[in-house]
């Protein structure tokens, strides 16, 4: 406002109407009454757990595929420590430009997780060492251990998923509550069961509805490898 008491600018908020595609994920198994009656309840629970587990794998795979599809390249990593620094910060710059948001997560496939854990400095010390009680890591850009996927390379929360294609590395912002680049929605509908008297059987199924949305595609950056 200038001068004082002059009219201030009026801004109208515009809320976008985005269409989000919904995907139905489901699986089923058919059992005879003999299988049901002659099998222990514990064994039946294994069947139900398997249905739920397969649904969870399919849901995760859909999210992983859609996240990678939405990503835009921020460069190529040659496998060295120095180039990793450049690639990650190039991605962070691409995310921050014109938005003032910073990345929060690094999503990688298991092979890339292995590459990160094996990176060493010129003296052979791990760049991402395991830091135990009372020990201080040297040259620690983050920390990692071969017994866990947890880590924070360059301050980013590491997420490792075997449903990603090999050589996948994605830098983005999620879970912050504001400025999230990628969103995931899920409605688990659960187990359904239907008797089929004509064949003395029972059909059991498990299903749910899943959606993903690339809210800010420019903030989903991938780093490829040669």
Each predicted region: which residue ranges?
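Extended, low-charge hydrophobic alpha-helical regions
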Residues: 19-38, 116, 120-124
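Short helix/loop capping segments that flank catalytic or ligand/cofactor-binding pockets
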Residues: 1-2, 8-11, 39-40, 115-118, ...
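Short, contiguous, pocket-lining structural segments
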Residues: 17-21, 39-47, 64, 80
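Protruding loop/beta-arch "assembly-hinge" segments enriched in small, turn-prone residues
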Residues: 13, 60, 68, 187-226
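Short, highly charged C-terminal tails/helix-capping segments
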Residues: 67-76
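Long amphipathic alpha-helical segments
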Residues: 43, 47-67
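Assembly/oligomerization interface modules of large self-assembling protein complexes
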Residues: 1-25
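Extended oligomerization regions of viral-like shell subunits
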Residues: 75-208
């Amino acid at each position: 406002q200038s001068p004082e008491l002059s009219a201030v600018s009026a801004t109208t908020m515009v809320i976008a109407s985005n269409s989000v595609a919904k995907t139905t994920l489901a699986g089923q198994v058919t059992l005879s009454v003999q299988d049901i009656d002659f099998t222990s309840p514990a064994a039946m629970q294994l069947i139900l757990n398997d249905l739920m587990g397969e649904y969870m794998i399919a849901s995760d795979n859909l999210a992983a595929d859609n996240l990678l599809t939405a990503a835009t390249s921020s460069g190529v990593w040659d496998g060295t420590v120095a180039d990793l620094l450049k690639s990650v910060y190039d991605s962070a710059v691409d995310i921050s430009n014109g938005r003032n948001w910073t990345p929060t997560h690094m999503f990688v496939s298991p092979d890339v997780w292995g590459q990160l854990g094996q990176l060493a400095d010129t003296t052979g010390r791990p760049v991402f060492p395991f830091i135990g009680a009372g020990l201080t890591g040297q040259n620690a850009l983050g920390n990692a251990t071969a017994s866990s996927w947890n880590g924070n390379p360059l301050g980013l929360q590491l997420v490792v998923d075997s449903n990603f294609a090999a050589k996948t590395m994605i830098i983005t912002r999620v879970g912050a509550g504001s400025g999230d680049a990628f969103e995931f929605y899920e409605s688990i509908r659960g187990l359904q069961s239907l008797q089929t008297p004509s064949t003395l059987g029972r059909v059991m199924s498990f299903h749910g509805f899943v959606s993903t949305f690339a809210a800010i595609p420019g903030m989903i950056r991938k780093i490829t490898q040669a």
